[in-house]
UniProtKB/Swiss-Prot annotation:
Family per similarity comment: Belongs to the GARS family.
Entry keyword annotation includes Manganese: yes
Annotated protein name in UniProt: Phosphoribosylamine--glycine ligase
Enzyme class: ligase
Binding locations of Mg(2+) 1: 277, 289
Organism: Methanosphaera stadtmanae (strain ATCC 43021 / DSM 3091 / JCM 11832 / MCB-3)
Amino acid sequence: MKILMVGSGAREHAIAKALNKTADVYTYMGRKNPGLARISKNYTVNDESNFNEIIKFAQENNVELAFIGPEAPLEMGIVDELEKEGIHSVGPTKSAAQIETNKAFMRKLFEDYDIPGSIKYGTFYDLDEAYEFIDNFDEPVVVKPIGLTGGKGVKIVGDQLADNDEAKEYVKEIFHQKMGGFEGVVIEELLLGEEYTIQAFVDGTHLIPMPAAQDHPHAFVGNKGPITGGMGSYSDKNHLLPFLTQEDYDKSVEIMEKTIKAIAKEQEPYKGILYGQFMLCKDGPKVIEYNARFGDPESMNVLSVIDDDLAKISKQIVDGTLDSVNFLNKSSVCKYVVPDKYPNTHVADTVVDVDEDKINELGAQVFYAAVYQDMDDSIKLTSSRALGVLAVKDSIKEAEKICEEAIKYVKGEVYHRNDVATEELLNEKIKHMEEVRL
């Protein structure tokens, strides 16, 4: 089978690697990702928003279906355009992708269809009304731009914001900058608990969940600093998490199933990957937000333990015949290596040296993200996350240890969170959840 891969990050590298076990991958990427280039039967480097070029590349290589990695092309309607040319995609249409690309749409969907896991919130297109909501709410809030911001637009009182007065200042900034493409904002209650992710394959009707994972979005050790796209993640061999019970997992999946039914009624059938970001609270799972594609880094966790044919699954998704998917009973840990002082880095265009042979000898893998391969084949940093180092073992503890050893073979002006998935941090999360449940 010939499959078109759209995207140029570590998520796409992980997807392509899984597809490549049984299919030929043809990659359309915005910059030359060395891992993707190596895997691909053919590739081109071009603007990921140029749909005419994407379609031309797909047709020249006679691909049978497409797998869309990032959210931006989904928001712009790449799936709709490919469908017009007879190329089916693993990825939702523009209207169905609103579950991620429009936070106001997502919250209203929960309200209209009485989906469990909803929270107190308000959507505002008037600045004074937003201020009034915050003043009357009288509790710490979370402020979100309505549209896409690359995972970096959410700010929380008690974290990035000192108090609700600062929240109002941030609301003003969102309005004036039209952050996320909207002159509007979603304001939500601040939830207390532990965040986690469940991703699922969806064929329009059937939803098959993957192992749960937990991301670490804060830039610095100890869950400090600004929110990033994710500094690392882990999954456990029982497909749960140390603080997440089977009942919690099942309730989360039920919420996702009700969501895809609601999307089908409101817009059209949802096909592709659905990523649910949840908060486990005292009274059960609550939905923080959805993504219309694999998470980054969580894609690396689940795709590294999939014990099935991703190309076959992709075909079943577009055909509406999704059946079952098998996963190994293994634990995984992924840690992101990023430029020094990320996300406010000044070391872009410097060389990062990656000894993949040594990393592979240790039993770890590398997934390249926002790096580019220069004319002399050197790998250079950009201002974003550089690469994910992932290990799969029988326990989180073993996988974390391998990850740390492997990262020693990445040299350059780089940094990583060495506390991701450590026993100490996991125990903190277990203790925190026990306190929340009291």
